[in-house]
């Protein structure tokens, strides 16, 4: 079982169990805000099966394909591309996305979508009321697992609800302060294989 795209999709390798989509007018408006007001930022949209962006030669596009292994496809214009199952809109900046979005983008859209930083480069926008925590709770009910039988790990703001939905939760030591405060415990940083160290104790 997999939780993907900030909790918007819960699936097996062959079947989608739960999916939440962004209203078209919301992600279209977000795209226009980025185009018109954030010239140093890029953006892409995600569906349950692939992502779409406008420039295959951009730094963002190459990172998503080369480092993350995304199935991301180039289209000439996101706003003119027929797609009805957008689950996430993401803004990209190479070093300060949250700061770039703070003056206009976030205040404009935070009442219409769940917006959270997922690293210095990314601001993820999900449907309202949808996050990794709602996905964890869906899985707990689906599998008959109690919160006390659940362990989660996180490092960024989009992980907080997930940490709060588990009986045992860890923030890696390099996580943001808000995430460390939300988790019940901490573990070593990701470059020290902190998550793996904890998982080995379960075996």
Predicted regions and their residues:
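Short, hinge-like loop/turn segments at secondary-structure boundaries
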Residues: 1, 19-22, 59-64, 132-134, ...
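Alpha-helical substrate-recognition element adjacent to the catalytic core
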Residues: 1-14, 18-24
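Conserved acidic, metal-coordinating active-site core of Asp-based
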Residues: 29, 33, 40-153, 174
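A short, compositionally biased
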Residues: 4-5, 37-40
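Short, well-ordered alpha-helix to beta-strand connector turns
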Residues: 6, 86-87, 166, 183
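Mg2+-dependent phosphoryl-transfer enzymes with acidic/Ser/Thr/Gly-rich catalytic loops
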Residues: 124-203
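Hydrophobic residues in well-ordered beta-strands that form the structural core
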Residues: 3-4, 45, 171
């Amino acid at each position: 079982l997999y939780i993907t795209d900030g909790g918007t999709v819960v699936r097996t390798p062959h079947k989608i169990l739960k999916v939440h989509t962004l209203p078209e007018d919301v992600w279209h408006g977000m795209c226009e805000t980025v185009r018109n007001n954030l010239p140093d930022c890029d953006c892409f949209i995600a569906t349950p099966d692939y992502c779409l962006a406008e420039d295959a030669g951009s730094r963002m596009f190459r990172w998503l394909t080369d480092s993350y292994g995304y199935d991301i496809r180039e289209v000439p214009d996101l706003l003119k591309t027929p797609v009805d199952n957008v689950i996430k809109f993401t803004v990209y900046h190479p070093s300060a996305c949250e700061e770039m979005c703070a003056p206009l983008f976030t205040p404009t859209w935070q009442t219409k979508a769940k917006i959270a930083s997922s690293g210095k480069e990314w601001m993820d926008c999900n449907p309202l009321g949808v996050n990794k925590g709602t996905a964890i709770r869906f899985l707990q009910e689906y599998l008959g697992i109690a919160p006390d039988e659940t362990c989660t790990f996180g490092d960024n703001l989009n992980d907080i609800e997930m940490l709060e939905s588990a009986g045992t939760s860890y923030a890696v030591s390099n996580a943001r302060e808000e995430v460390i405060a939300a988790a019940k415990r901490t573990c070593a940083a990701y470059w020290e294989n902190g998550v793996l160290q904890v998982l080995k104790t379960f075996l």
